[in-house]
Amino acid sequence: MEFLDEFPTMGRSDLRDLKKSIDGGFREFSRTYGEGLENFFDPLLHFLVWFERLLVNTPWPIVLGAIAALVWFGARSVTMVIATIVCFMVIGYLDMWEDTMATLAIVSVATIICIAIGLPVGILMARSNKFQAAITPVLDVMQTIPSFVYLIPVVMLLGIGKVPGLIAVCIYALPPMARLTNLGIRLVDKEVLEAATAFGADYKQKLFGVQIPLALPTIFAGVNQTIMMALSMVVIASLIGVAGLGVPVLRAVSNQYLALGLMNGLAIVALAIIFDRVSQRFGRRMQSHREEGAGH
């Protein structure tokens, strides 16, 4: 009955040897290719540092004006612009301006990278069922594995710093972009595609002239999810040297500072709401513009 009482497990020595072999193999890989990977990501590091310094060192009225202009361009809403200005004024007044600019820099760069990778991956998934079947398990792993787990190999390869944190954010935030791009393209009405084919459109013309424009609401939902997940990683990424609003939150947790944690947490929420509302309205506006153009 011992077999039923205790689940059969690998011997401790065998399990220890297995773990040692995995750790040893990855350390050897890190020693061999770590420097090359660091050199590969150097341009990304320089760009991120430059963008962060640009936001931090530029006079705040100019930064606030630029943010308000971007919000107006995306949302075309005076209310949204005023709400954004008020949020950033409160954030600055509570001495969180520099941390907010650092967070804004890493989230913006991570979102751009996720869109640049996720959009083509989603298009390929929509084009090929085999590619979708192959890449879906990878996206599942990226989305479900605890974020602390993939911090380990990233830190072992690249050490502590901005780039490892950025890579961790991108790994976590990329899957929604690819999934929803694939979904949006696949949901385009087949009759519309047949009509485009009847008018002599080739694959590229159908993709960029029909499928992607009609899939924009779903694609922008993917952008929204990517931004939200990138912001949710800010606190975790601060564990490996990423500056921003996550650092005070960690300090507040360690020292039980309720006010500090609450203020910085609400600043992250404010950024999330602004990004979300602006991207949603921009997506709807582009879709309505396409529909009006098609009507004429």
Protein language model features and the residues they cover:
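N-terminal, non-cleaved signal-anchor transmembrane helix
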Residues: 1-105, 112, 284-296
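Alpha-helical membrane-interface segments at transmembrane helix boundaries
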Residues: 45-56, 97-105, 109, 132-135, ...
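Transmembrane-helix boundary motif in ABC transporter permease subunits
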Residues: 69-73, 91-98, 110-139
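Membrane-spanning helices that line or support transport/gating and their immediate boundary helices
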Residues: 99-103, 123, 133, 137, ...
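Generic hydrophobic transmembrane alpha-helix motif, especially the helices
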Residues: 106-109, 114-117, 123-126, 139-173
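Glycine-rich helix-loop "coupling/hinge" segments at transmembrane-helix boundaries
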Residues: 156, 185, 230-271, 283-296
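Transmembrane alpha-helices
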Residues: 167, 171, 203-237, 259, ...
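Short cytoplasmic-facing helical segments at TM-TM junctions of multi-pass membrane proteins
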Residues: 177-225, 249
